[in-house]
Amino acid sequence: MDDKWKIEYYKTKSKKSPVEEFILNLDVKTQNKIVDALALLKEFGVTLSLPHVKKVTETSLWELRIIGKNNIRFFYIARTEKTFLILHGFQKKKQKTDKREIKVALERLADY
């Protein structure tokens, strides 16, 4: 039996995946870093900690941090059945995370 966690991506009602589209529009080197980070998340699940993941204050969201020059971030939640739902991906441009990015993830969670 496979003990690894599973990854799901948020999909709109029309079955589009904005997170996967975001990833596909990044350069290959960054995509490879994302694959590596997602592999860590699948392997270690909720026990993965800084510098890879961080709890988003005052929300149910967690932030997966892709270390590198592009500062890529993903907001996700842990669901039952050992599954993570990736809600939103973005490039962090400032020290503090833009509240609009958190809002997008929370709206997608409510839509899910």
Language model regions located:
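Conserved catalytic cores of phosphodiester-cleaving nucleases, focusing on short active-site segments
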Residues: L87
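GIY-YIG nuclease signature motif recognition
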Residues: F75-Y76
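Basic, Lys/Arg-enriched alpha-helical interface segments
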Residues: M1-N71, T80-F84, K92-Y112
